[in-house]
Amino acid sequence: MSHYEGDLRTPESARFAILASRWNARITDTLVAGARQSLAGNGIAEANIDVIRVPGAWELPLVAARLAAAHEHAAILTLGCVIRGDTRHYEHVADRCAEGLMRVQLDFGVPVLNGVLAVERAEDAEARAGGSHGNKGEEVALAALEMVNLLEQLP
């Protein structure tokens, strides 16, 4: 019986894309900083990290697909923040974004990590962007490193 499990060791030459929305920039900027810090802290050179900004979460799957199709990145980290408002727009954006990101990951075989916060209130986002619940950008970066390592091991 074989056992496979990823860890944080990744080839130094591996490139990572951090794809982040500008909407709710106060939150997403903190998520990006956390992801960059986490990658760098695990040996990924700044030159091997590309940061791409899009208008909002809705645009993340399209740009993730373009990046995945180019096969230049070992993983794509997506970061955004959707806060519930008074309309159903929140559900449409959050759900379709998550579905689109999953489709990109499955279609291209490239890890696409979903770090899009879908929260009720701005305070909930702040708690997940360096507040009491940590930094989701850091968590997504660690998951990306682990997935790259795991996929390298699999037959």
UniProtKB/Swiss-Prot annotation:
(2S)-2-hydroxy-3-oxobutyl phosphate binds at D86, T87, R128. The active site is at H89 (proton donor). GO terms for biological process: riboflavin biosynthetic process. Catalyzes the formation of 6,7-dimethyl-8-ribityllumazine by condensation of 5-amino-6-(D-ribitylamino)uracil with 3,4-dihydroxy-2-butanone 4-phosphate. This is the penultimate step in the biosynthesis of riboflavin. The gene is ribH. This is 6,7-dimethyl-8-ribityllumazine synthase. It comes from the Bacteria. Keywords: Riboflavin biosynthesis, Transferase. It is an enzyme of class 2 (transferase). Belongs to the DMRL synthase family. InterPro entries: LS, LS/RS, LS/RS_sf. Pathway: Cofactor biosynthesis; riboflavin biosynthesis; riboflavin from 2-hydroxy-3-oxobutyl phosphate and 5-amino-6-(D-ribitylamino)uracil: step 1/2. One of its GO terms (cellular component) is cytosol. It catalyses: (2S)-2-hydroxy-3-oxobutyl phosphate + 5-amino-6-(D-ribitylamino)uracil = 6,7-dimethyl-8-(1-D-ribityl)lumazine + phosphate + 2 H2O + H(+). The lineage of its organism: Bacteria, Pseudomonadati, Pseudomonadota, Gammaproteobacteria, Lysobacterales. Forms an icosahedral capsid composed of 60 subunits, arranged as a dodecamer of pentamers. GO terms for molecular function: 6,7-dimethyl-8-ribityllumazine synthase activity. 5-amino-6-(D-ribitylamino)uracil binds at W23, A57, W58, E59, C81, V82, I83, N114. Its EC number is 2.5.1.78.
